Amino acid sequence: MSNGTVRNEAIAPNAQRLLWAGFLAILAAGIGFGIRGGILANWAAEFGFTGAQLGAIGGAGFTGFCFGIIIGGVVVDKIGYGKLVVAAFLFHVLSAFITFAATGGQSQNTAYLFLYIGTFVFALANGTLEAVANPLVSTLFPHNRTHYLNILHASWPAGLVLGGLVGWILGEGMQVGWKIQLGLFLVPTVLYGVAFFGQSFPKSEASAKGLSVGQMLQEVGILGALVACLLVGLFFKEQLGGILGFFTGNPFFASAAWGYLAWAVALGLLVVVGIKTNFSVGSLLLFVLFLTHALVGAVELGTDGWIQNITGNILTPAQGKILFVFTSLLMFSLRFCADFIEKRLNISPIGLLFICSMLGFIGLRMVSGIETFAGAMIALAVYAVGKTFFWPTMLAVVGDRFPRTGAIAMSIMGGIGMMSAGLLGGPGLGYAKDRFTAEHLMTTSPAIYETYKAPVPSRFLFLDEVTGLDGTKLSAAQTAPARTPDQQTVADASIIGDRETLKADSYIPLVMAVVYALLFLYFKSIGGYKTVRIDAPVQAVTAR
């Protein structure tokens, strides 16, 4: 392998068409995500969900993505990009039908089932599309991956902007129902289907060299697979066990036996990877990048799922939507500047990630203390700049340094980030909100807490159970035109819970900053950050 020079040309004549088709695909995901973030309050008011239940539904929007992107990443070089695009299109349409089946008057369990599964299938479609788009753009533009992957992922905040505007104009302004709002994500779904239709696709560098799946997995190895398998085991134990227990009432799904079964599944997957790679340990650097991307998913996407709800609670729902649109628009604009930052300012991808982590930490601390709309705009601008380059730049680093992995390492990394957001970020923030709010209200007004507490306790990993506030009662207190003293106390406690949640969340990018600083020193010790290329055909070997 050798270090490649930096150029900007693409390797296929239809590269720009494919780039913008991928842009539209991720745009559809962003619009759906942005609208869902704005209708959480509608779901809480209509069905009485707690913060933890809303967090679990939001979490399904990440875990489904993980399965789509990892499975898609493993098979994409074998079955081709086109078949995965068709599958994603069908999943997107199916998700709308399932989600819309949740209606008022149903039992809470039934509505929860439809919303959870609908969100999961929506995310499955998003993950399948990203299993196409990320390696496709990385292959099309091998000499400037950071720039073009950031352009590709500019569609995510663009989708959030459009989704936020839908909530602001149709939801807050025109009082349009949440189903009509959510159904608008089908418009870009049709557009990306048309854009991809009839196109030819290039092979990844690793696939063109004739590498097998086992060979592509060797740099991932046992270490990299361990990160993904731990999250898969956690999904089976916590989320799948939780939803099966919720609907069946069978205590088995909350028992130690179910936990052992979940971890056995994870171990089995790890053994399969070991067999495919001849039990290669894998790259330590890639292992560190996978772990760090788990933090990226938790802090960026996990926070995105809650930030509109939280800022809308601290200020007003309308202001929360405006702020969400503002930060997303800022991210959209900045992602077109990655080439300028990297080439003109001479900041390496790792240096950029370090700077963003520090801004993310500072921004979240500032957001936790906002009192006014103007102050919120400044604080969220700092946070938005910080989170702008995390996801696409991490993907670019993997594409630059590990070309032998083809689409697999990039897809596993995306899956790890989304799985972390779904299992740790979204539910963790929901649990934190329930916990901090309940603790404050129990301390200051225990009688009011007893009146407003939820019927079902919230759990998160190994932490103690906590009983948050009933979503319907909290929503009534927050939206009352003239609050009673008790309602004001509950609303104030909820705001305090939101502030403490953001403070706790801020420590994640601080840890990331330490990791990126160490990686920066590592690359400096080996002569600087450089793109690695596969120069010669690789001899085929048997992967047992």
Model-derived regions, located:
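Extracytoplasmic gate region of multi-pass secondary transporters
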Residues: 36-40, 221-258, 274-325, 422-433
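C-terminal ends and interior cores of transmembrane alpha-helices
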Residues: 90-108, 358-371
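Glycine-rich segments within core transmembrane alpha-helices of 12-TM secondary carriers
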Residues: 144-167, 171, 411-433
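Low-complexity, proline/glycine-enriched hydrophobic segments characteristic of transmembrane helices
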Residues: 242-251, 425-506, 539-544
